[in-house]
A protein has these predicted regions:
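Acidic, metal-coordinating helix/loop segments flanking the phosphotransfer/catalytic sites
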Residues: 30-47
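Short, conserved "switch-loop" micro-motifs in signal-transduction and mechanochemical regulators
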Residues: 83-84
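Receiver (REC) domain active-site loop signature in two-component systems and cognate sites
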Residues: 54
């Protein structure tokens, strides 16, 4: 499974990438903001992990763009962010985020959230 990891922090991208590798995923492409994420998003990407707050284009705007395209509308999306209040989680879900991880997190939490998204999507198919 190929992942797209979008975060403006190189350190955070490294943490997410290393966590993905620790739980068995090795095909990963990275981007520093939502606009870059959309540029590198191609049909080989099967799962998106994004931050919320980023310059140029934030995570929610990128999610809305992904959801608005028939080619990518059903792509699984996980948001990894420091925003943890209920209204933020609701707003992310309304934009089309499938699940939500609050920073900091462990590789195990990331794995559980990814598996949860994939199970829900499999059940909906």
């Amino acid at each position: 499974m190929k992942f797209l990891v979008v975060d403006d922090s190189p350190t955070m991208r490294r943490i997410v990438v290393n966590s993905l590798k620790r739980i068995g995923y090795s095909e990963i492409v990275e981007a520093g903001n939502g606009e870059e994420g959309l540029e590198v998003l191609d049909p080989s990407v099967e799962f998106v992990i994004t931050d919320w707050n980023m310059p140029v284009m934030g995570g929610l705007d990128m999610v809305r763009a992904i959801r608005s395209s028939p080619d990518t509308a059903s792509l699984p999306i996980l948001m990894v962010t420091t925003r943890s209040v209920r209204d933020d989680i609701v707003q992310a879900a309304q934009a089309g985020v499938n699940n939500y991880v609050v920073k900091p997190f462990t590789p195990q939490v990331l794995k559980e959230k990814i598996e949860s998204v994939l199970e829900k999507m499999k059940g909906a198919a």
